[in-house]
Amino acid sequence: MKKLLLSLIAASLWTMQGTAQQQLPKVVDKNGNLMDMPTFDSPEVEHIARKRCGTFMESLSNSKNGQTRAVSTTPNYVPHEGTINIPVILVEFKDQKFSVNKPKEAFEQFFNGTTQADLGNGNQHNYGSVSQYFQAMSSNTFNPVFKVYGPVTLDQNETYYGGKNASGNDEKPNQLINDAIAKLQSSDEAIKDATVFCNGGTTVDCVYIIYAGLGQNIGGANTTVWAKTGSASGNTLVGKNIRWYSMASELSGMKTKDGSIMIAGVGVSCHEFSHALGLPDIYPSVGSSTGYAKNNQNMEYWDLMDGGEYTYNGGYCPTPYTAWEKEQLGWPVDIQTLDKNQSVTMPTSKEQGGTAYKIVNPSNSHEYFLLENIQKKGWNTHQYAYGLMVYHVNEPSNAINMWTKLNDNEGYPGMAIVPADGLCASADKQENKGSVEINGEKESYYIEQLRGDLFPGTFSRLETLNVTELSDDHYRPNWHWYKSGNSGYEKTNKALQNITYDTTTGTVAFNYIHDTTTGIKGIERMEATTKRIYTLDGRYVGTDFNALPHGIYIIGGKKIVK
């Protein structure tokens, strides 16, 4: 829900234009007050207001007006295999210009760069580009290429598109798309043929907008534009209908250590583009009885589609996709079901080709736990903790799409962390927004609470943890099955014992007990192997090699010719 921020005036926030010395704007903190722009990697960074996009989206009607994600039960999403082309328009407002140096070059690097050079606005702090993120998540089966245009300057002030009221129903994202395209097409960069952006079809799959200044979702006033994705129904590009739009802000509300304003982190753009691929938000929607501010109700920073878009100073190294999300998109991921007593060793993470494990409810195949090894590598390099991540999944019986609301039923989340320390804290709960002293320094209590979520709790700094067992007797929140109709909880009768994490090698190990009611029988040692078979383009084709036609397949990360 938008907060009415005491008549914040955009002109008072932004006076940097046309001055010899760049004047930095104020940003909005978690309590709705103005604060000085904090320095990157300082404890004050965590004070910036970072709001879920659903705070805005849920206040709008579920119509096909481009202002909601609930656009259809069977929408056609952006293709997520092969190479696709997406136009990006850099948009300035009448009263708000770009602040970063060389904006076109900066956002070409932001979206497509293979390296992140310092262009004067902390660009090098992004771990990689948006395209590199999706290449990594898809094991190189998906390669989005972004064509950057602009900047173009619109005739209206930012407030015209960002709105003013607390309900959020006066934002005009579709008008922003329409006006941006009109300005582009009247410029020297006018697109002559949009076929390249139809990616084999007859409709432009998605238009991406980067708008100047702050976003309301990350430090901006209630008059700024909110990062979002939705239906672009009614908009066209060179005679081609546009299916989706995504948009995000230029800035993230921080300054570099030498005082320069910083370009945004790639996290929000990765999150928004993932909606155009069909993935839903994982956090609870504000329109539900749950709202945001509930502990142990979702994934928080452990999922890009939750708070993970803001990992590392506001999203400069966003959290990788979970195994669940990779499977939803049909991207290569090895998930093996645990169905007997065994000793499990997980030497590598799924990002490095390792195995994730599934424990299935014997009474409901749509309900299960997923187990992943989170290591300090790749897009997890700046994560808050490492070790065994356990999360509870309870899928709806129908197909997942971008408007699916997994976590709107309080106490019965559809996808939520099983925290080693007993608390997966909500970033939106007031009691979690404060600071705590660690080694003589004030740190974010919320971030410190995240450090205890992964087993065995090695990285917790709030308390010394070594949680070596997860079972009905050694219970943690979300470690249970749901009774029919979400009428209560049932014991799992499963157990993970002797959980370890080797901080040198990054190896996770544990003993799995399949049925605790029958006592502990022999433990069969199980190394991380895979039987899942994929085509060269990343399509999963089952586990029976003999049943497949002649061709080249990928099994366990290796090419096999039949």
Give each language-model segment a name.
Residues 371, 498, 538:
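Hydrophobic, well-ordered secondary-structure elements that form the walls
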Residues 518-562:
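C-terminal outer-membrane/trafficking sorting elements
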Residues 351-355, 492, 547:
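Residues that act as N-cap/strand-start positions at coil-to-secondary-structure junctions
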Residues 378-390, 547-557:
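Short, surface-exposed, low-complexity cationic segments
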Residues 27, 359-361, 532-535:
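A short beta-strand micro-motif
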Residues 21-269, 280-290, 298, 393, ...:
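Propeptide-to-catalytic entry region of secreted or membrane-anchored zinc metalloproteases
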Residues 1-23:
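Bacterial Sec-dependent N-terminal signal peptides
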Residues 206-385, 394-396:
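Extracellular hydrolytic enzyme modules, especially secreted metalloproteases
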